[in-house]
């Protein structure tokens, strides 16, 4: 066995490993020569040699192994199908109203430029019934947050803390809807006055707290609603068709007067503006009606007296 593989340590059996005497020197000349010679006399171990730990056998490499090398077994190839998320339109179909609304609001918050795209896709104002439905839901949420108390029915500071978030949500929603329901967003002034009166009545139904400072947001909203009344009345003053509908003017003037009395003068400015426009319109319409009547009489006299006056007035110039 070669040395690279290793060899056996220790003494061989049958006395082959014993040191021979001088008389036994049939195959070797002496002990020293026998120790240095390995021809015909086996392995002779010196007496002073100590047996140590066996040498570790090293592992043979692939090149040293005999025979052909066995190739590794390759796994079979299969078409693997992996999971994938739903498409966006499928996710939207599976969302309910609350989840879809929350997702859109988060998307707008992350990408503010999306607001312009939404305005382009939804250019028209929704149906007025949608406004009323939304505002009534917000108002109901305000009353749902009123804490129950057995000792007192009054709205104290603790109740304001509980209701503050719902109150701000309702007031902001009210102003947003009112601003979307007046010109130039809409051209129907009669519908605008109707919805503005509805929003003012709804604001009057807001709870009134014991501490006046807790009514701060409500009072600020009254000021904003009063400015919206001013704006809408100015738009109505330039619309002859709306001013000609006297019953509608008197109806909303009466409602605005009632709102001013209920709120102790919070609508004084729009009420005075309404009276001014009504007076100006009445002042302009009465002389105009008299002038039209006199002009008609003069034209009739000229028609009866002289046929040339018709050519002078140009009444028949455009008649085929």
UniProtKB/Swiss-Prot annotation:
Sequence similarity: Belongs to the cut8/STS1 family.
Gene name for this UniProt entry: STS1
Domain of life according to the entry: Eukaryota
Name listed for the protein in its UniProt record: Tethering factor for nuclear proteasome STS1
Cellular component aspect of the GO annotation: cytoplasm; nucleus
InterPro entries: Cut8/Sts1_fam, Cut8/Sts1_sf
Entry keyword NAD: no
Native species: Eremothecium gossypii (strain ATCC 10895 / CBS 109.51 / FGSC 9923 / NRRL Y-1056)
Keywords from the named record: Cytoplasm, Nucleus, Protein transport, Transport
Reported function: Involved in ubiquitin-mediated protein degradation. Regulatory factor in the ubiquitin/proteasome pathway that controls the turnover of proteasome substrates. Targets proteasomes to the nucleus and facilitates the degradation of nuclear proteins.
Gene Ontology MF terms in the entry: proteasome binding
Known partners and oligomeric status: Binds the proteasome.
A GO biological process held by the record: protein transport
